[in-house]
Amino acid sequence: MAELISREGNKVEFKVAVPAAEVNRAYEQVWAGLARDVRVPGFRPGKAPRKVIEGRVGKGYVEQEVRDRLLQVHYPQAARELKLSLVDATIDPQDLNNGKDFTFNVRGETYPEVTLGDWSDLKLEATSPEITDDVLNRTLSDLQERNATFESVDRAIEASDQVTIEEQGEDGGTYPVYLDVAEAHVRDALLGKNKGDTVEITVPAHQHGDHEHAEHTVTVKIMDVKTKQLQELNDEFASSLNFESLDRLRADLRNELQRRAQQEGDNARREEFVAHLTERMQADIPQALLERRREAMMQEIQDDLSRQGVKWSEYETFMKEQGKLDEFMADLSKNAETRVKRDLALEKLAEDLKVQVSDAEFNQTMTMLAQANGLSPEQLSKQLGPNGINSYYASIVRERALQQALAQLSGPQAETVAADQGEQQAEGQEESAEKSEE
C-alpha cells in the first residue's frame, strides 16, 4: 500500500508498506533460488538446510536479495498507484524481518508541469518511399554484385577486377584489392598493370584514429588478377538464392522493399509528430534535469568507448588536439535537451489520452523482454533495478500514447502501427530503460 506523504512542486515523498505475506513469499523465493544454485559438499542439490546455506552466503546476502526483490516489484507498483511519473528517486528501506511488514520511504522528483499545443488537426506530411521498377531492378543488381564470382585472367588490370597484391618489406602481407571500391590512389596505381608487375603506391598524408601519417610509398607485387563474373538474372540465379523462380524472387524482394518503405514512412511520421509536440509544448524544465540526462549520456559514451578498449581521457585529449571538444560537448547538451523534451511531451500526451498499462500487461512485456535477452524475469528485474523498471514502464506508456495519437491523425497516409514496429520497440526497450533511469 502506498501513501503520499508530501508533494511540493516537483518534489514528492511517499511511503510504501509491503504486507508480511508478501515478505514471506519473497523469502521463500530467495531460499528456493539459493537451494537450487548453491552447492554444499555432502548435500544433494536443493537438499542443504537453510542454516547451512546461510552460513555459506551470509545472512546479509539473503536479506539483500529479499529486499531487492521486494523493491523491484513494489516501488514501481507504488509509483503507478499514486500516478507519479518519477524522473529520479532515492529509496530508504526500513528493517526487514521475515513474518513482518516491510516498509520503505521514497523521495523523488516528478517531471515538471507540461502543456501541449493542439495537435488534433495536425496533417502529417511524411510519406513512405515509392518502390518503383527502377528501385527493384537496382536491388536485383546489388544482389548480382554480392553474389559475383571471380576468375583469374591473363590481361591488364581493369576497373572492376579483384587484384591480389603482396606488400614488400618485413611487415608485408598478401591481400585482395577490389578496384571498384578501392581508394583512388590505389586504383590509379594498379590500373593497366599485369600479374607479376611490381608497383609503387603513393599513400597521401592521412589521419588514422588518433595518429597522423605522413605521405609515404608502399611497394607491392601483383600476384593475381581476377575478373568479376555476374550471374545472369534468370531462374538459375534465383535458385542459387533458394527461390523457385526469378518471378518469385522479384515478388518477394518487392514485398520486402515495400515493408521497409512502410516502416520508413511510419518512423518519419512518428518523428514529425514528436517534433510538432516538442516545438509547441510549454514547460519550465529544471536545469538539474537536463544536466542529469547529459551526465547519463556521457556515461553511455564512456561505456561504449571502454568496450572498444579506449579510455575517455584518451578520447578527450584527442578531441582537444583536434579542436573539437567544445563542439562535442555542445552537441551532447543539445541532444540531452532534445531527449528530455521528447520524454516530457510524450509523458503529457499519455496523461491527456489517459493511457494505462495494467500490471498484467507490464509483467507480460517484462517476461517477453527477458526471454528476448536470454534472461529470466527475475534476472532482468535485478539488472534494471527499481528505477530502471519504473523507467521501462514509463517508456511503454509513452510508446502506447504515441501510437494512439498517430492512429487518430489523418495525413497522406493514415498511421497503422505494424506488428514488426512493436517488435522493434521490445528489442530497444531495455536500452531505453537503462538510459531513462538516469
Curated annotation (Swiss-Prot):
<dbReference type="GO" id="GO:0043022">
    <property type="term" value="F:ribosome binding"/>
</dbReference>
<dbReference type="GO" id="GO:0051083">
    <property type="term" value="P:'de novo' cotranslational protein folding"/>
</dbReference>
<keyword id="KW-0413">Isomerase</keyword>
<dbReference type="Pfam" id="PF05697">
    <property type="entry name" value="Trigger_N"/>
</dbReference>
<keyword id="KW-0132">Cell division</keyword>
<dbReference type="InterPro" id="IPR027304">
    <property type="entry name" value="Trigger_fact/SurA_dom_sf"/>
</dbReference>
<dbReference type="GO" id="GO:0043335">
    <property type="term" value="P:protein unfolding"/>
</dbReference>
<dbReference type="InterPro" id="IPR037041">
    <property type="entry name" value="Trigger_fac_C_sf"/>
</dbReference>
<dbReference type="InterPro" id="IPR005215">
    <property type="entry name" value="Trig_fac"/>
</dbReference>
<dbReference type="InterPro" id="IPR036611">
    <property type="entry name" value="Trigger_fac_ribosome-bd_sf"/>
</dbReference>
<protein>
    <recommendedName>
        <fullName>Trigger factor</fullName>
        <ecNumber>5.2.1.8</ecNumber>
    </recommendedName>
</protein>
<keyword id="KW-0143">Chaperone</keyword>
<dbReference type="Pfam" id="PF05698">
    <property type="entry name" value="Trigger_C"/>
</dbReference>
<comment type="similarity">
    <text>Belongs to the FKBP-type PPIase family. Tig subfamily.</text>
</comment>
<dbReference type="GO" id="GO:0005737">
    <property type="term" value="C:cytoplasm"/>
</dbReference>
<dbReference type="GO" id="GO:0015031">
    <property type="term" value="P:protein transport"/>
</dbReference>
<keyword id="KW-0697">Rotamase</keyword>
<feature type="region of interest" description="Disordered">
    <location>
        <begin position="407"/>
        <end position="438"/>
    </location>
</feature>
<dbReference type="InterPro" id="IPR046357">
    <property type="entry name" value="PPIase_dom_sf"/>
</dbReference>
<dbReference type="GO" id="GO:0051301">
    <property type="term" value="P:cell division"/>
</dbReference>
<dbReference type="InterPro" id="IPR008881">
    <property type="entry name" value="Trigger_fac_ribosome-bd_bac"/>
</dbReference>
<feature type="domain" description="PPIase FKBP-type">
    <location>
        <begin position="160"/>
        <end position="231"/>
    </location>
</feature>
<dbReference type="GO" id="GO:0044183">
    <property type="term" value="F:protein folding chaperone"/>
</dbReference>
<keyword id="KW-0963">Cytoplasm</keyword>
<keyword id="KW-0131">Cell cycle</keyword>
<dbReference type="GO" id="GO:0003755">
    <property type="term" value="F:peptidyl-prolyl cis-trans isomerase activity"/>
</dbReference>
<dbReference type="GO" id="GO:0061077">
    <property type="term" value="P:chaperone-mediated protein folding"/>
</dbReference>
<feature type="compositionally biased region" description="Low complexity">
    <location>
        <begin position="418"/>
        <end position="427"/>
    </location>
</feature>
<dbReference type="InterPro" id="IPR008880">
    <property type="entry name" value="Trigger_fac_C"/>
</dbReference>
<comment type="function">
    <text>Involved in protein export. Acts as a chaperone by maintaining the newly synthesized protein in an open conformation. Functions as a peptidyl-prolyl cis-trans isomerase.</text>
</comment>
